[in-house]
Amino acid sequence: MIRPCLINPDDLNIPIGDVIPPPQLHLHTGIVNWAWDLVKKMLGEDQHNVLLNWSRTRSITVRGYQGTGLDGGNSKNFLKASKDLHIILGEKNAAPIKDMLHKFDLVTKACFSRDLLPDWRMILDSFVTSVWELVSFCKIELKIKLSITWKVHIMVCHVRPFLEKTNMGLADWSEQTGESAHHKVEVEMKRLRRDINNPLHGEKMLSGCSRFNSKQF
């Protein structure tokens, strides 16, 4: 690490949302991939092709982070197709996943735009309840430990206080603009990239970022 952390609040007791706004795009993909990973676990390796075939017929392609998950567009497609999960999981096992994803979809409509819907609190609370019901179902019925990822944690614990303070939806704090710059940055970084174990790795990364930024002026 060649630069200190940029986030160093004087008061460590302040709400995390006052320092880092909830990342709208990553929350969306995080919740959906949480469900996606659970579906994969429920089906098992021997039924992986069943999931892939079900996905292909619904325009879902696995090409997310490190090639194991769903990116933004495919997350939306999986969210839309989740109503059909009973086809591969059965009605009983699919029900709590479908319920959670349906309620998350309502949350995105209520909270992820610039303006909050009047009943956003009720919609968000209903989603939070569905998360705990899914965790409980996995533990009791499936004997699966469904861990809470940091994105699920943010969605359950930190989004509501942030929205109550700002009285606005998450759109104005979306990281999507920065995400869309990945390709342009990648072109510059390819010229200077070093293996992470190379002693010049950090220096070259900083140089690449500086060169890219200087070209934007």
Mark where each language-model region is:
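A structural signal for the principal folded core domain
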Residues: 1-217
